[in-house]
């Protein structure tokens, strides 16, 4: 908290996204494991539902996963999503933000994204981090924090 966020430029369905292009605005970066899975879909729909509220609070919302731009495009169209989804296929952005971690399922370990949200202030510094996010009510909590900045 209080540190400058790592800069990045990545592809997104509507074109590229550059972190530097968001300067002067608050930014919510939510890292999620995978498109079209129940928790990830709910989270994206919650942030989409509140998109206008975040905009009124001067805050841009972006989601980041390892999925391809093509996958993000299909995910957005299928669910009518209104948030920017950024592809991190090489996982280097996830690594720089410290959310690329060893996970386990059914006794097997693998590397993946820990569901995490980062709130960035207008100066590009980390204002708050939510690690190991539980989706229910999360977007509401993030909006309240963004409004309070």
Regions found by a protein language model. Name each.
Residues 1-149:
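Chalcogenol-based redox active-site neighborhoods
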């Amino acid at each position: 908290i209080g540190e400058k966020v790592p800069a990045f430029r990545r592809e997104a369905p509507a074109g590229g996204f550059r972190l530097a292009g968001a300067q002067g605005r608050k930014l919510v970066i939510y890292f999620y494991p995978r498109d079209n899975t129940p928790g990830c879909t709910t989270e994206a729909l919650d942030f989409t539902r509140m998109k206008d509220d975040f905009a009124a609070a001067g805050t841009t919302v972006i989601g980041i996963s390892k999925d391809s731009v093509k996958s993000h495009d299909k995910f957005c169209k299928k669910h009518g999503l209104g948030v920017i989804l950024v592809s991190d296929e090489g996982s280097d952005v996830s690594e720089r933000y410290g959310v690329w971690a060893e996970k386990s399922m059914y006794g097997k370990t693998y590397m993946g994204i820990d569901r995490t949200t980062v709130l960035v202030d207008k100066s590009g510094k980390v204002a708050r981090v939510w690690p190991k996010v539980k989706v229910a009510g999360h977007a509401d909590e993030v909006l309240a924090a963004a409004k309070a900045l």
